[in-house]
Amino acid sequence: MLGAMLHTLLLLLLAELGALLASGPESQSSFLEIIFPEKIEDKTHSEEQISYIIPINKKQYTVHLQKRYFLTNRFMVYMYNQGSTSFHSPNIPAQCYYQGHIKGYPNSVATLSTCSGLRGFLQFENVSYGIEPLQSAFTSQHIVYKLGNKEKELIFNKNSRNIEMPTNYGILINKKPKSPFKNLFPLYLEMSIVVDKALYDYLGSDSNIVTNKIIEIISLINSVFAQLKVTIVLSSLELWSDKNKIPTVGEADELLHKFLEWKQAYLTLRPHDVAYLFIYNEYPNYMGATYPGKMCTAHYSAGITMYPKDMTLEAFSVILTQMLGLSLGISYDEPEKCYCSESICIMNPRAMQYGGVKSFSNCSLNDFEHFKSNEGAKCLQNKPQMQRTAAAVCGNGKVEGDEICDCGSEAECGPDSCCEPNRCVLKAGRACDSKSPSSTCCKNCQFLPEKHQCRPEKHLYCDIPEVCNGSSGNCPPDVTINNGHVCKESGTICYNGDCPDLDRVCESIYGAGSVNAPFACYEEIQGQNDRFGNCGKDNRNRYVFCGWRNLICGRLICTYPTRMPYNPPNNSTASVIYAFVRDKVCITVDFGSSVKEDPLRVANGATCDLDRICLNGVCVESRFLRDQSKTCSSKCHGNGVCNSHGVCHCNAGYSPPNCQYPTTKRSASLWSGKHDLPMERASKNQEKKWLLSLYIVLIILASVFLIGTGWKGLKQCGSKEEESMSSESKSEDSTYTYVSRSTSETSSMTSTSS
């Protein structure tokens, strides 16, 4: 019977794959902006409906959001390790996904998650923006970037066929009436997704990262299917993390057939309406395959979809939406006969090339009504139990749900534990769990006293130490001085509580006299794009070339102050490279696999050029951060600075919220757990004024004395012997590269004239 059905197999031979950019902001279009989204608080404090103000390109947009649920309460992630299967409930909250619209733009769609900062997409009528938090979500800093658009050139595989439109859908598509939307009742499509090994690696080789990206795709798809009152529910996710379980190369019908056989053998016990295999292919000949109109036919409810190189999640969600639409009996639109309220309809063959909101056309709705009238949607009428709260598991070492504490198993907890291991509550007489990593204000199961420092400052002028409040075992959240506050005379600005000083880092590694190398050294070493000089690695473990503008934002290169070879401490696997460039000896080290984080990776916030800082390997303008910090701190009346929440943090002797009036009470800001600004910092300006007055008086006295003694000496001295000047010849600039792999290995030297 399967062979008889293959003639209805629909191949998506769409070659519009090109130059749709990767799903990270670093490879998006040139528009990229650092922003500070602001949540609009309401009196109800309900999280079911929330709103944000999001600035884009100097304009404020108000986004209204409604919570959406599309993970089943039995949702599991399946993985493989050396052939054995493991499954787990992912550590991902199910109640932080939202959909909504942008105020004043009736055809807009917002698809965002709030699990850790704001992450997702803002889709206007013909343009889309991605938004995601920077590394430290507590700073409220996000980046917003413009997604690819229809102007991008198309890249074709040299073996790919021309664009073909399917000719036989098994559905009547001509002369579609322009009927209004009919009343629809809610339907639920349970989906099981399988990710092949290549795509798993391409998306990050990390189960949490890949799971989050798949959920983002499902969220985008739901924003389109909401028009049909269809909710796409993710029931299970399988990651082929070690190797593929079936071959993933070949013709579309062959792959679909193999996946269908595998699905029937291995997914039987996992409830689902349809199963899809996502395959990574850099330049595929086709986009996917499925059986049109067979969603509720168990032996044919499957599909495969290709994920090309450099494709955005938004573009891939369009492909998957079209595939699911075909399975639901919805054919491709004929543009001259079908219309929708958007600039392009979702079932238009070229929809994936366009940014912005997309919707189903009148033709699509008629197709779907026809599909339902023939009982094609009977399997979609049962509503699965949705996962609305994270299920707490007592004994796993994580505090979840209503748990007060969780120290793990009985053996892990031990007899001295503050926590009851089987009930996850505190033992009688215990105030807190001192074994919990987050309980830095707890000792011997009791609260530490008020004012006890629980988190030291990273930098004197960019951070403030947190102290315990005496009534909680947890240290207050980390709040820093606002990013953009100038922390050094050279113009360096605060970033995430630190004052990134490359000279200081060089000195700490190589000793006194070592400073950040001149740009010529970065050109020489970073230009090689190898383990010594690069801007990180991509998803395929290849070194990323920094580009001329971003050379200083890769790996740190320093000047070397001595003639003794550098010996990395306690690291026999490290390799050292020296470069002699324009009379400077420059150095950098590859620490190899012995370190988890590269200590020479240039930190975010480090200065890379005039009025520019490094941000995720890119040299970007710092003007916005500086201006935002100045504007915020201007409301502190010169007696304080803004913190990372945009609230004045007052100098000693001044009271919040605006540091305008003196106070006898020591209170730095409205945020509890914070000391005042240090006294030496608060009185810095007054001290400078006093010292300046003293210097002026001393200078006047010294001048009077020197004039008197100078006149006397002038009489006694008739002439002065001239000194001869010695001249120095200067050699031409040369570049020398010396690589020392270890003390036992042979050293080599190459030279090129510049």
From Swiss-Prot:
Q: Where is the EGF-like domain?
A: 628-660
Q: Where are the transmembrane segments?
A: 690-710
Please give one Gene Ontology molecular function term for this protein.
Answer: metalloendopeptidase activity
Q: Where is the signal peptide?
A: 1-22
Region of interest (Disordered), ranges: 720-754
Localization in the cell:
Membrane
Q: Where is the Disintegrin domain?
A: 391-483
Q: How does it sit in the membrane?
A: Single-pass type I membrane protein
Keyword Cell wall biogenesis/degradation on this protein? no
List residues modified as Phosphoserine. 23
Q: What is this protein called?
A: Disintegrin and metalloproteinase domain-containing protein 32
User: Gene encoding it?
Assistant: Adam32
